[in-house]
């Protein structure tokens, strides 16, 4: 039919619709076909039908059209059609099988697309829909009573395209949405309304279409966002609707039955005789009675079933007598119930009914079978004692089937019957029978529904009631069964599933769950246990203390040792044989080694399978190696040995997981770690080897088993892992778990494969080996070391190993503590095997175990010499070395490469503390001693001491060198203090050579001295941080010292006065300088006591290096010894008027030792003026200074030919001047640096005298201040008025200097901002900090007043009180000043005073007079000029270079930190006098002009050198110099 096709079409289209797709459609319904026909039909009954199908809550309310109407076809918009969607009104979609008596389906108008009901405008025509009242609120979606005939299509947009949707909406939206009311109309009025709606005004429809489009779009957008929620809600509602639909169907069925009855009565009245009516009425009565009987019967059956269940429940509760007592009753009950049922069936059917019904007593036609189906499932449980749950399910299923199938039966059977009833009375009877069947089915359905509801509501309460009332109920069962007529459904609650079955089921579930839980628990416990064990093992492996590891290692080693003593003995013998064999056939041996590697891998794999232990692998590796080395030894013995050993280790594995690594010193293990036994080329196996993971925690080297060691002579190489021996040596050592010493057997090459962690410096750091297993074949060979007969180049470290056994007893015992590369020269000469003896190498910390170097490995117990020589293999050393290498610092190891051969005994005696040898060399060897106990070669270099220095020669010469070093260091320190040639930074204890013969090498370092050029190269090759620059620098220094010595001490002396000399330095030189008559008074002879009592002026700046301090102390002591004359010198010598030109040559200081002389020469200040000619030679740095390699600060004095103003720098410049250095010098009224700062402030203003500070060359950039400026600065902190105007002659560009990058020694001008009260900051703020910092590196202390560690302004620490007092010009205790002076200028102590310099320390002036430390010009100015000499410009002004009183020295020390250059401004007359006087400077009391010397930092050594040259020859000051 049309309706059917429409419904099917809509259903199909609806099936294709999905919630994800949101069609925004505004559909105008075209004229509905058949509308007129529909209108023609008038249904007798108008009823609002309820939805038959579960519909989403959002779906349009189902519309039930009257039977007579033809459901309208669902309109199919083109868009919907194109999309495969049809939204429309479907007829009979909910009740597919229900037809009216005339064959018309019940019309249920349903929106086809329940999913999209919310998003799609309702397709139900307005005023057509009878909205289900329950869903009215949900169906109030925009509906349009009027729609255009033409459909308006709206594009389809995915849910996420909001922007596109908005754009379309904007385009299409022409008017505000018009909302229409949804009118609920009866179905009968639908067609007229429809016609009206078709004829609506096109304008209105158009507007509405637009508004509908807008609304639809908006609705679609909203729906798209809420689609998921709606979908869920729809699902829930659909389920609810399903339930409600069932109820509706039941109700409708009842109504249909009523209708059928009515129709029957009508038809009977119309077509039948009265007799038929009577019969029909009788049939109805009988049917009603029968239905009642059936209902009662069903109720009784249910009671019966419940009673049975109750019985079983009670029997379950009372397992004993109840079950026995009542079981028979259950059988009776079943029989009685059956009989009762039969009675019901037979008695319930009257004779009249029998005529209509088949003799069977139950209608079999149609769906009569349902009754049987219903009864049978219910009866079945009686015999089966099954839970009623199945029955419930069956009933539910049957009820559904009955609901679905009965309507079909009705429409198929009843409709024709009624049509033909008028023709044949038999048809009435059939109809009556079917009606009876229907009634029966309905009764069953009613009962079933009732039972279902009742059961659901009373399940829980019934359970409790049944359990409680079982006994009584069971007792009363027979009477109840006798009274089946009573409806008992309500009286007796249907029993739930029997307790026994439930209990059984629950018990099974519990048991299964318990089982699962137990299994899970076991799994969890296993996991936890495994995790705990692994954690424990890991903790043991990784977190174990070094001592614990060592202890475990020892225990394991001892046990293994005991187990394998015999095997080790055999291995030792085999090793000896193998060594001989290797010596004879090295190449064959190499091939064997390769095979051994393969075998070792195979054996390792096998052992791993057997042991499954990491320690096993190393053991197996060792085993394979041993097998190859010991071809004669039965493999079975090895297997047994290794298995036992591995088992023991496995036992200990948990306690000592890392012990395996230590144990794994076997050759195979080594081969695995270090690659192919030949050790040539890259060892690819290292990457795969598991040991690397254990490397860092690698057990410390195991006690060395005694090894037969060939006499090996060669440089000691510390390998990160172990020192490898040549293959031949390996034969001897191989039995001892061979370390990487196992090297190229044929070539006797040693590979040092560092097992230890890669030192932070893997590069050419001294002695640091790369702990990682790197193909050692690449290691660099130390060029200096003796070329081994067989040399394997290992990139990580140049390792030269001569496998041949050198006649010289081998010195290269490797230090276990620090696995540094030990260069083992195995001389090709192979000593006779008889010489071979197994020696246990004590662990030797060649590096003099640096604190960091003490690693777990280092904490090795004494070597276990007990091990058989074969077992002497270093087990832990690889790991230990890797750890130790990190600790050892580069440079310390290779300090000396010496050819000295020491006996093993000596070496051992020297190094008794090292119990475990890292290097195990086949042949005779000596344990490397900590080669150098003194400060490590470059103190700046890493703290680790010489880790793997070549020990051969060094060990023999070590004591001699140390003794020489002690003396030499003392001498050198004194010489350096005097000359200040070496920067404290560069100070290297060994490097400074005492003897001039050694000067070149010694200066370079003791290492060079001991090792020779080749040895020093070894340091470099080994990675020692000695730069070629450093070496060349050291050599140059030595050369410069030698040249200076050759030139003579005179220049050095000149340089000394030029630089601020420490009192100690002055003391040394003092005897040479005759005291001039005039000025000594100004400088009271307090100085000599001051030297002793030097107030400890603490330079807040960096303290001198330890060596420097020690040097100072020694120098002071020596100077006190040599400087007993100092007191005489203390009396100040009046500065002779002699021109400074003569001064430099005149300075006659007792020639210091050659080294000192050289150093003194070096101290000669560089010519800060560069090439500019200085007006006075005084300004020129003494020629000695030229020789000075790195004079730190060049003090240059420029004789002021010009007015003092010219000498005076603008105060802004002066402020930058570190007058701190000035304070360093004693306040000699004329020239003392401190005095010069104060005095010069005064004096410089007095006259433009030559500014020569006692022969001091004026460094370039040095600024001279007039006394006026100094005074002003002292009074207020540096005020910076533009003083450049006074300096116009010399400082015309001073103001511009602010904008120029500061020159080397330039003082940066400071803006005039009042007084900067921090003396240090005030000066440093002005100083170019960079030059100051450079000076630290570039200049020697001799030439600078600043200490080595002196910091630039920002870096400089706050001055101590004493320092501030010095800066402020307040006297500090003389002793401290002396101490600081000596500390700051360790090398000056020995220098002789320059001719003008007073040999005795200047007397300490008042606070104003003496500056105790570097002073700011402001501070100098701020201080009252207490020094009467300065204030009066006494003719007795001291020469600037006068030996500084302790206070001066102290101030110098402080100033030295600042590294200012102090330019002493003296009167030319003084300088002339000095020059004229020659060596005996005497100050003329009538010096008219005062010199102010400002010591400025000069940053460039070259500049300093130039300044020196200028000091010597150039009268012109360099452009950088400012006066």
Curated annotation (Swiss-Prot):
| Record's subcellular location | Cytoplasm, Cytoskeleton, Microtubule organizing center, Centrosome
Going by the entry's taxonomy, the superkingdom of the source organism is recorded as Eukaryota
Q: What Pfam family is a match for this entry?
A: TALPID3
Task: Please give the knockout or disruption phenotype noted for this protein.
Answer: Failure of formation of primary and motile cilia in ependymal cells of the prosencephalic choroid plexus. Centrosomes are rarely found near the cell surface but are often mislocalized deep within the cell and do not show coordinate orientation within group.
Polar residues: compositionally biased ranges: 1-16, 1099-1108
Return the Pro residues bias intervals: 1073-1088
Identify the tissues in which this protein is expressed.
Ubiquitously expressed.
* Segments of this protein annotated with the region Disordered: 1-20, 57-84, 1070-1112, 1137-1262, 1294-1313, 1373-1410, 1498-1523
- Which portions of this protein are annotated as coiled-coil regions? 428-466, 499-528
Q: Where is the composition biased (Low complexity)?
A: 1137-1149, 1236-1251, 1507-1523
Q: Which GO terms describe its biological process?
A: centrosome localization; cilium assembly; motile cilium assembly; smoothened signaling pathway
Q: Where is this region: Required for centrosomal localization?
A: 498-585
* Keywords, in A-Z order: Cilium biogenesis/degradation, Coiled coil, Cytoplasm, Cytoskeleton
The biased composition feature labelled Basic and acidic residues covers: 1373-1386
GO CC terms of this entry:
centriole; centrosome; ciliary basal body; cytoplasm
Q: Which PANTHER family match?
A: KIAA0586 PROTEIN (PTHR15721), PROTEIN TALPID3 (PTHR15721:SF2)
As annotated, the protein's associated disorder is: Defects in Talpid3 are the cause of the spontaneous mutant with pleiotropic phenotype including polydactylous limbs with many unpatterned digits, vascular defects, hypoteleorism, abnormal dorsoventral patterning of the neural tube, loss of endochondral bone formation and embryonic lethality.
Query: What is the documented function of this protein?
Result: Required for ciliogenesis and sonic hedgehog/SHH signaling. Independently, involved in regulation of cell intracellular organization. Involved in regulation of cell polarity.
Which family does the record assign?
A: Belongs to the TALPID3 family.
Q: What is this protein called?
A: TALPID3 protein
Which lineage is the organism of this entry classified under, starting from the top rank?
A: Eukaryota, Metazoa, Chordata, Craniata, Vertebrata
Which gene specifies this protein's sequence? TALPID3
């Amino acid at each position: 039919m049309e309706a059917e096709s429409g419904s099917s079409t809509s259903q199909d289209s609806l099936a294709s619709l999905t919630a994800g797709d949101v069609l925004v459609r505004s559909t105008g319904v075209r004229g509905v076909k058949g509308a007129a026909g529909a209108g023609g039909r008038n249904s007798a009954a108008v009823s609002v039908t309820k939805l038959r199908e579960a519909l989403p809550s959002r779906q349009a309310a189902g519309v039930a059209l009257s039977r007579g109407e033809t459901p309208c076809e669902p309109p199919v918009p083109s868009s919907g059609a194109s999309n495969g969607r049809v939204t429309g009104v479907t007829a009979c979609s909910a009740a597919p099988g229900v037809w009216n008596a005339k064959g018309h389906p019940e019309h249920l108008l349903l929106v086809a697309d329940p999913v999209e009901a919310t998003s799609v405008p309702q397709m139900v025509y307005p005023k057509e829909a009878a909205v289900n009242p329950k869903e009215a609120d949900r169906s109030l979606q925009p509906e349009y009573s009027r729609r255009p005939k033409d459909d308006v299509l709206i594009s389809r947009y995915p849910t996420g395209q909001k922007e596109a949707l908005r754009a379309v909406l904007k385009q299409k939206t022409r008017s505000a949405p018009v909302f229409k009311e949804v009118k609920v109309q009866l179905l009968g009025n639908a067609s007229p309304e429809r016609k009206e709606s078709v004829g609506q005004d096109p304008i209105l429809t158009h507007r509405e279409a637009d508004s509908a489009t807008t609304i639809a779009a908006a609705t679609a957008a909203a729906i798209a966002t809420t689609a998921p929620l709606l979908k869920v809600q729809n699902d829930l509602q659909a389920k609810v609707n399903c339930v409600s639909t069932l109820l509706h169907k039941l109700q409708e069925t009842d109504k249909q039955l009523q209708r059928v009855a009515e129709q029957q009565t009508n038809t009977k009245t119309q077509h039948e005789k009265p007799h038929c009516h009577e019969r029909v009425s009788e049939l109805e009565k009988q049917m009603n009675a029968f239905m009642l009987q059936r209902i009662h019967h069903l109720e009784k059956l249910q009671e019966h079933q419940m009673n049975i269940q109750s019985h079983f429940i009670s029997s379950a509760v009372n397992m004993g007598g109840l079950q026995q007592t009542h079981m028979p009753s259950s059988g009776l009950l079943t029989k009685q119930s059956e009989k009762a049922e039969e009675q019901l069936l037979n008695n319930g059917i009257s004779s009249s009914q029998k005529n209509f019904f088949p003799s069977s007593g139950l209608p079999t036609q149609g769906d009569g079978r349902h009754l049987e189906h219903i009864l049978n499932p219910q009866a079945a449980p009686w015999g089966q004692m099954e839970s009623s749950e199945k029955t419930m399910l069956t009933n539910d299923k049957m009820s559904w089937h009955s609901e679905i199938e009965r309507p079909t039966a009705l429409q198929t059977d009843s409709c024709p019957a009624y049509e033909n009833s008028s023709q044949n009375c038999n048809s009435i009877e059939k109809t009556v029978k079917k009606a009876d069947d229907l009634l029966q089915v309905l009764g069953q359905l009613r009962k079933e529904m009732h039972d279902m509801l009742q059961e659901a509501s009373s399940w829980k309460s019934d359970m409790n009631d049944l359990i409680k009332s079982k006994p009584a109920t069971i007792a009363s069962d027979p009477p109840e069964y006798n009274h089946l007529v009573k409806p008992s459904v309500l009286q007796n609650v249907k029993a739930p599933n029997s307790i026994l079955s439930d209990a059984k089921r629950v018990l099974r579930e519990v048991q299964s769950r318990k089982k699962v839980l137990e299994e899970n628990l076991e799994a969890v416990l296993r996991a936890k246990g495994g995790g705990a064990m692994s954690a424990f093992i890991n903790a043991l492996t990784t977190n174990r203390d070094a001592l614990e590891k060592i202890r475990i290692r020892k225990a394991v080693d001892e046990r293994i040792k005991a187990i394998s003593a015999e095997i080790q003995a055999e291995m030792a013998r085999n090793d000896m044989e193998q060594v001989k064999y290797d010596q004879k056939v090295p190449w064959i041996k190499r091939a064997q080694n390769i095979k051994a590697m393969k075998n070792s891998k195979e054996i390792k794999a096998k052992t791993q399978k057997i042991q499954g232990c990491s320690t096993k692998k190393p053991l197996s590796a060792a085993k394979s190696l041993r097998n190859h080395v010991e071809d004669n030894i039965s493999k079975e013995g090895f297997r047994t040995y290794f298995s036992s050993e591995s088992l023991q280790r496995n036992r200990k594995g948990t306690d000592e997981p890392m012990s395996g690594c230590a144990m794994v010193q076997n050759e195979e293990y080594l081969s695995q770690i270090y690659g192919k036994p030949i050790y040539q080329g890259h060892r690819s196996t290292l990457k795969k080897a598991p040991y690397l993971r254990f490397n860092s925690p690698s057990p410390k080297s195991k006690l060395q088993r005694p090894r037969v060691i060939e006499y090996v002579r060669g440089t000691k190489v510390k390998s990160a892992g172990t020192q490898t021996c040549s293959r031949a040596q390996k034969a001897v050592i191989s039995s001892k778990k061979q370390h990487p010493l196992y090297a190229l057997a044929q070539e006797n090459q040693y590979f040092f494969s560092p097992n230890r962690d890669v030192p932070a410096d893997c590069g050419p750091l001294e002695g640091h080996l790369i702990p990682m297993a790197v193909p050692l074949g690449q290691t660099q060979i130390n060029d200096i070391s003796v070329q081994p007969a067989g040399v394997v180049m290992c990139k990580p470290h140049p390792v030269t190993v001569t496998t041949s056994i050198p006649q010289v007893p081998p010195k290269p015992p490797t230090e276990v503590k620090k696995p540094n590369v030990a260069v083992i020269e195995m001389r090709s000469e192979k000593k006779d095997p008889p010489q071979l003896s197994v020696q246990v190498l004590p662990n030797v910390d060649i590096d003099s175990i640096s604190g960091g170097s003490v690693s777990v490995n280092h904490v090795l117990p004494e070597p276990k010499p007990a091990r058989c020589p074969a077992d002497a293999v270093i087990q832990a050393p690889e790991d230990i070395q890797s750890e130790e290498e990190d600790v050892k610092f580069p440079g310390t190891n290779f300090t000396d490469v010496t050819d000295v051969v020491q006996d093993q005994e000596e070496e051992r005696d020297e190094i008794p503390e090292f119990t475990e040898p890292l290097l195990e060399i086949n042949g005779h060897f000596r344990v490397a001693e900590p080669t150098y106990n003194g400060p490590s070669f470059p103190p700046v270099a890493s703290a680790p001491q010489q880790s793997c220095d070549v020990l051969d020669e060094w060990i023999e010469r070590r004591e001699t060198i140390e003794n020489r070093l002690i003396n030499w260091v003392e001498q050198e320190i004194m010489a350096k203090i005097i000359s200040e040639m070496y920067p404290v930074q560069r100070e290297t204890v060994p490097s400074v050579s005492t003897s001039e013969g050694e000067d070149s090498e010694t200066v370079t370092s003791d290492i060079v001295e001991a090792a020779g050029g080749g040895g020093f190269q070894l340091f470099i090759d080994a990675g020692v941080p000695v730069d070629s620059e450093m070496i060349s620098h050291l050599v140059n220094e030595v050369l410069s010292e030698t040249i200076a010595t050759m030139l003579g001490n005179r220049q050095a002396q000149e340089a000394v006065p030029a630089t601020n000399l420490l009192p100690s330095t002055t003391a040394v030189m003092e005897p040479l300088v005759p005291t001039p008559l005039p000025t000594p008074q100004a400088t009271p002879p307090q100085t000599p006591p001051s030297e002793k009592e030097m107030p400890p002026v603490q330079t807040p700046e960096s303290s001198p290096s330890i060596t420097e301090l020690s040097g100072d102390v020694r120098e002071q002591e020596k100077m006190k010894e040599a400087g007993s004359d100092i007191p005489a010198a203390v009396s100040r010598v009046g500065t002779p008027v002699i021109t400074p030109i003569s001064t430099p040559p005149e300075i006659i200081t007792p020639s210091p030792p050659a080294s000192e002389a050289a150093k003194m020469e070096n101290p000669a200040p560089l010519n800060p003026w560069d090439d500019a000619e200085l007006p006075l030679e005084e300004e020129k740095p003494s020629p000695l200074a030229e020789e000075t390699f790195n004079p730190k600060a060049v003090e240059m004095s420029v004789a002021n030919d010009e007015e003092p103003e010219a000498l005076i720098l603008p105060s802004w410049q002066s402020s930058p001047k570190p007058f701190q250095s000035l304070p360093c010098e004693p306040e000699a009224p004329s020239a003392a640096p401190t005095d010069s700062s104060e005095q010069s402030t005064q004096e410089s203003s007095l006259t433009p005298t030559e500014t020569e500070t006692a022969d001091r060359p004026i460094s370039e950039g040095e600024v001279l201040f007039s006394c006026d400026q100094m005074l002003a600065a002292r009074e207020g902190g540096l005020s910076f008025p533009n003083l450049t105007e006074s300096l116009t002659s010399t400082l015309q560009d001073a103001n511009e200097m602010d904008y120029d990058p500061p020159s080397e020694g330039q003082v940066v001008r400071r803006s005039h901002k009042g007084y900067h009260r921090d003396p240090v900051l005030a000066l440093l703020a002005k100083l170019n900090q960079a030059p100051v910092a450079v000076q630290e590196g570039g200049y020697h202390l001799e030439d600078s007043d600043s200490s080595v560690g002196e910091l630039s302004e920002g870096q400089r620490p706050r001055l101590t009180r004493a320092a501030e007092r010095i800066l402020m010009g307040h006297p500090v205790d003389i002793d401290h000043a002396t101490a600081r002076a000596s500390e700051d200028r360790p090398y000056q102590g020995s220098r002789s005073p320059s001719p003008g310099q007073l040999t005795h320390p200047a007397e300490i002036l008042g606070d104003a007079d003496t500056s105790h430390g570097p002073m700011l010009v402001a501070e100098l100015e701020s201080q009252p000029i207490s020094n009467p000499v300065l204030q009066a410009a006494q003719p007795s002004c001291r020469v600037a270079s006068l030996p500084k009183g302790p206070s001066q020295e102290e101030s110098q020390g402080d100033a030295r930190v600042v590294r200012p250059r102090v330019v002493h401004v003296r009167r030319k007359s003084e300088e002339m006098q000095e020059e004229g006087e020659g060596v005996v400077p005497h100050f003329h009391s009538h010096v008219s002009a005062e010199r102010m010397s400002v010591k400025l930092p000069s940053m460039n050594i070259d500049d300093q050198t130039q300044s020196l040259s200028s000091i010597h020859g150039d009268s012109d000051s360099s452009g950088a110099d400012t006066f």
